[in-house]
Amino acid sequence: VNESWVLTAHAATDVEGRPVDGQTVLSDDCEITAGSSVRLGFCVTTPLSASARLSFLSDHRPAGAVDGVVLMAQTCLLGPGPENHVRCPQWPTSVVLVRGRRGLAVKSRKDIFVDGSLATGLTPLSSGQVISGTDFRFRLEEINPER
């Protein structure tokens, strides 16, 4: 995947200890410092996906309760291994969310269910649907940006 993530600094920002004036391309596994003390880790978990993960290295957190942020390109991997964008250590397998023209779809090597029905192949998703397997369950929820 030959895509890059570009950071545009609108205030005091460092990447790997170097001040950013304007824009910079983020490299895998780099540290971003916003202001004087907010530290974020940037990681592209697998070369097979342009999606990336931001994790909080300092004690700062946004107003909503989150542990990290996924910057989703075309795919988002959820599962037990280090290549996953969302780490779920207890899951027996990985699940992939795929962005298409009509929205998100889901797929896995193991049997998964969408709202209780067996998902075959790449299965389209909509907000509110529940995706589950033998040892996991999650709900796809649309975030209202106006809140």
Which sequence ranges carry the predicted segments?
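Flexible, surface-exposed loop/linker segments and immediately adjacent secondary-structure boundaries
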Residues: 53-61, 66, 73
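Short, compositionally biased
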Residues: 41-59, 139-147
